[in-house]
């Protein structure tokens, strides 16, 4: 199984980052994608990926929350990172109109610039969208024919948004959000709508610890070693074999990010 979304640069992992990676290996993961969400965190993510060759890779990009910081210098830094062999996607990029930590116009400018960069470098995009589905799709659609692909990371949207993203040829990333009986039931019901070859799985650790997991850690921190629980639950709700789902979602990630086949 492949973890497409781990925020390994988070300070929550400062005391045991190496052990977190080793526990992921022990849990049966074949690889992980470390998320870059700002210029500095993209640098750190790439360095961390370097420490675990053939197991960790990274993205390079600027999250919509950080879009106000996008400028020519940041773009140059992301471009410099993105040509490195273990940086396999542009992002996390997109729109977030839920909190608007950056003004909408700055978010749109940073998103469009990163789509242009992905086209230039022929890299897939690692996408974020919250409460902005229609505008997100409008900005993204003209670029898709010139991109290798993209995944909507940590999808928590509506059925209408899911159908829209699938119609655009995007892959869908599902997290432990779906394990939350308070807010994940609608998403749970939508799981069978996602074609198996478009589904990817992720923890988004250290966030989104699955609520239905037994023996949860006292610190409430999520980590990639808990991905098997998400695989098991998603397989249950889709009516599929967990090992089959683990394998096909692994293959999907490796295909999108142009990685070698799992061993």
Curated annotation (Swiss-Prot):
- Subcellular localization: Cytoplasm
Q: Which residues bind a divalent metal cation?
A: 92, 128, 153
Task: Provide GO CC annotations from the record.
Answer: cytoplasm
User: Its principal location?
Assistant: cytoplasm
Q: What is its EC number?
A: 3.1.11.-, 3.1.13.-
Q: Which UniProt keywords apply?
A: Cytoplasm, Exonuclease, Hydrolase, Magnesium, Metal-binding, Nuclease
The molecular function terms of the Gene Ontology recorded here are:
3'-5'-RNA exonuclease activity; magnesium ion binding; single-stranded DNA 3'-5' DNA exonuclease activity
Q: Which cofactor does it need?
A: Mg(2+)
Subunit description: Monomer.
Q: Record's family? A: Belongs to the metallo-dependent hydrolases superfamily. TatD-type hydrolase family. TatD subfamily.
| Role according to the record | 3'-5' exonuclease that prefers single-stranded DNA and RNA. May play a role in the H(2)O(2)-induced DNA damage repair.
Recorded hits in HAMAP family, A to Z, give:
TatD_exonuclease
User: PANTHER family, from UniProt?
Assistant: DEOXYRIBONUCLEASE TATDN1, TATD FAMILY DEOXYRIBONUCLEASE
Q: What is this protein called?
A: 3'-5' ssDNA/RNA exonuclease TatD
Organism in which the protein naturally occurs: Rahnella sp. (strain Y9602)
């Amino acid at each position: 199984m492949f973890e497409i979304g781990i925020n390994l640069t988070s300070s929550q992992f400062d005391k045991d980052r190496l052990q977190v990676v080793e526990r992921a290996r022990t849990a049966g993961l074949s690889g992980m994608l470390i998320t870059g969400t700002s210029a500095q965190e993209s640098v750190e993510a790439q360095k961390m990926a370097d420490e675990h060759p053939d197991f960790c890779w990274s993205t390079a990009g600027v999250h919509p929350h950080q879009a106000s910081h996008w400028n020519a210098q940041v773009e140059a830094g992301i471009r410099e990172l993105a040509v490195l062999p273990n940086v396999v996607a542009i992002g996390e990029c997109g729109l977030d109109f839920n909190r608007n930590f950056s003004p909408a116009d700055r978010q749109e400018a940073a998103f469009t610039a990163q789509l242009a960069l992905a086209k230039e470098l022929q890299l897939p995009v690692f996408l974020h969208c919250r409460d902005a589905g229609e505008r997100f799709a409008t900005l993204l659609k003209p670029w898709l024919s010139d991109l290798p692909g993209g995944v909507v990371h940590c999808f928590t949207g509506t059925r209408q948004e899911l159908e829209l993203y699938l119609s655009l040829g995007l892959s869908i990333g599902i997290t432990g959000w779906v394990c939350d009986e308070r807010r994940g039931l609608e998403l749970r019901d939508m799981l069978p709508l996602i074609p198996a070859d478009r589904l990817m799985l992720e923890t988004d650790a250290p966030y989104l610890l699955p609520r239905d997991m037994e023996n949860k850690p006292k610190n409430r921190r999520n980590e990639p070693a808990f991905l098997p629980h998400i695989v098991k639950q998603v397989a249950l709700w889709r009516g599929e074999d967990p090992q089959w789902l683990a394998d096909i979602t692994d293959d999907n990630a490796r295909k999108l990010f142009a990685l070698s086949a799992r061993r």
